[in-house]
């Protein structure tokens, strides 16, 4: 995301938490719906804003990098959105959040509607996006959907589980970072750039290794489903 994107993320968080609004009761009214249950550790507001901004920006770009094969980004987003819908329901329920020892976030049940709408949109989109694709998500769709997914996770205080739920996206992004970083390092160190993968992002590496496009997409779906299940099951295993 460019400078404008980061400004938008900061403004959203600024508005969400009422920073700078010193009218009596105003800031409290904005923060109160997102406060955690007593006894739950909270990081400082500035740290939280920096972490939240980073998570939203990084996830947005990670989804954008994943959108390289027909049906890949749409399907993995569908899985992640469904898992996030479950998390928002748990966070909104005082009994469920206490039982599973996750932060209780009053009012977060409204986000379940957004996560459900996101999953439904991905499902309808995927019908026309599977190979051979008739429509494409593009940068506008992938950046927005990735940012929305991360925003929901930040609002319900599940940034850590987002790393599992969106594991495919982060692996794709890390593959690009590692490939570019290693290439630049070896070019400076040895005078010749070297690569870790055959091609980046990771889905193109497997294509170069001989996998068919449908094989890559299908297996990434399986990985995404597995990670989503592990993330949800881990709530009970704490």
Located regions from the model:
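Charge-lined substrate channels and their catalytic hotspots, especially those that engage the 3′ end
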Residues: 26
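A short, charged helix-loop
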Residues: 30-41
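Alpha-helical transmembrane segments
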Residues: 1-20, 29, 44-238
